Amino acid sequence: MDKKELFDTVINLEEQIGSLYRQLGDLKQHIGEMIEENHHLQLENKHLRKRLDDTTQQIEKFKADKKESKTQKTEQTDIGEGYDNLARLYQEGFHICNVHYGSVRKEDCLFCLSFLNKK
């Protein structure tokens, strides 16, 4: 190998090393950007999961409250409807007390009246 070929080989190696160095720098920068993006995505994911949990808890609480109020309304409505039916039967002339239930009444019954006055 003469000096010129040796010099050309060294220049070629130097260019290859420079190219590899630039590629390594680009790769390092790209990895840094990916790590930063990953960190931001992890934070966003954490916040979204917390928000989802909070929203889910609020929805469950709302459903429970709604179910409870519906149950209370139903109980109140049922009690009111039963009372109204018994009052209607009494007005139509039937006993609603446990002593003479369903029989025709000729005059006011103290048992029936005491039952109607309960709340």
From Swiss-Prot:
GO cellular component, one term: nucleoid
Compartments it resides in: Cytoplasm, Nucleoid
Cofactor names: Zn(2+)
Effect recorded for residue 99 to A: Still self interacts, still interacts with DnaA, no longer interacts with DnaN, loss of localization
Keywords: Coiled coil, Cytoplasm, DNA replication, DNA replication inhibitor, Metal-binding, Phosphoprotein, Sporulation, Zinc
GO MF annotation terms: identical protein binding
Residues bearing the modification Phosphothreonine: 71
Record annotation: effect of changing residue 71 to A: Loss of protein phosphorylation, no change in replication inititation, subcellular location, or protein interactions, wild-type sporulation efficiency and biofilm formation
InterPro entries reported in the protein's UniProt record: YabA
Reported induction: Constitutively transcribed.
Cofactor binding comment, as recorded: Binds one Zn(2+) ion per subunit.
Known function: Involved in control of chromosome replication initiation. Inhibits the cooperative binding of DnaA to the oriC region. Thus negatively regulating initiation of chromosome replication. Inhibits the ability of DnaA-ATP to form a helix on DNA; does not disassemble preformed DnaA-DNA helices in vitro. Decreases the residence time of DnaA on the chromosome at its binding sites (oriC, replication forks and (probably) promoter-binding sites). Tethers DnaA to the replication machinery via the DNA polymerase beta sliding clamp subunit (dnaN).
Subunit structure, as described in the record: Homotetramer. Interacts with both DnaA and DnaN, possibly acting as a bridge between these two proteins. The N-terminus (residues 1-62) assembles as a head-to-head dimer of dimers with a single long alpha helix, and is probably responsible for tetramerization of the whole protein. The interaction sites for DnaA and DnaN overlap; thus DnaA and DnaN associate with different subunits of the YabA tetramer. Interacts with AcuB and TlpA.
Similarity comment: family membership: Belongs to the YabA family.
HAMAP family on file: YabA
Domain remark in the UniProt entry: The N-terminus is probably responsible for self-association. The C-terminal domain (residues 62-119) interacts with DnaA or DnaN but not both at the same time.
Protein name: Replication initiation control protein YabA
Name of the gene encoding the protein in the UniProt record: yabA
